Design a protein with these regions (language model features):
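Long lumenal/extracellular ectodomains of secretory and single-pass membrane proteins
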Residues: 1-125, 135-204
Length: 204
């Protein structure tokens, strides 16, 4: 039963225990295992794993991301190919007809980026959710976020995932935010750009 289950679920641990590293199909490695064992893959099958990562960039290989959280993905800054591929492979959990315009707090109390290990930082969760939600918006709100500030600014992120992470994490902030100013500026922005009602954010 155990062997049948392992085969059907395509778990990688039996191959690892049998030292069959070069026989591993990284396209089938589950998302959690891909994160947990990536250093072991590099250590025991450096050439094969390197080819796999290069394939992610070219689009000839694939990665799974169904069981990882956005903040777990952006912590892989030392594996940019894997991070980018897993980010793009994430399922879309935003219901139809719902959209979020993120207001991101990047103040010092939120911690820091790039920890890689250790406790999850609130900033990592804020940045990852902000990017995840903003890129799913429509019209002028796609890739847009609002700074946590007394004078909130509507800003865009662009480039690859690392570039967007940096842009959002280094945005200007203050000790408090003016919610009324956010709504006022949102209304002015929508009127100026003739945004349709169905393209307006439903949540902030």
């Amino acid at each position: 039963y155990r062997k049948t289950l392992a085969h059907l679920t395509k778990v990688v641990e039996p191959q690892m225990c049998a030292n069959k590293w070069t026989e591993m199909n990284y396209n089938h490695v589950p998302s959690k295992a891909s994160q947990i064992y990536k250093n072991a893959f590099k250590r025991h099958d450096e050439a094969g794993y390197k080819t796999y990562l290069e394939g992610l960039v070219k689009g000839t290989t694939k990665v799974n991301a169904g069981a990882v959280f956005p903040y777990e993905i952006i912590r892989q800054v030392n594996e940019p190919q894997l991070m980018e591929a897993q980010w793009k492979a994430q399922p879309d959990y935003v219901p139809e007809g719902i959209s979020f315009l993120p207001i991101i707090d990047c103040s010092g109390s939120m911690g820091w980026m790039g920890a890689k290990t250790g406790p999850v930082q609130p900033l990592e969760v804020a940045i990852s959710l902000g990017l995840y939600l903003s890129e799913r918006n429509k019209s002028i709100f796609k890739d847009m976020f609002v700074t946590f500030s007394e004078d909130p600014q509507f800003q865009y992120v662009k480039g690859n995932l690392q570039a967007r992470m940096k842009q959002m994490s280094t945005s200007k902030w203050s000790m408090s935010t003016n919610i009324q100013a956010v709504f006022d500026k949102l209304l002015n922005l929508a009127l100026k750009n003739n945004v349709k009602q169905e393209d307006m954010p439903t949540h902030m």
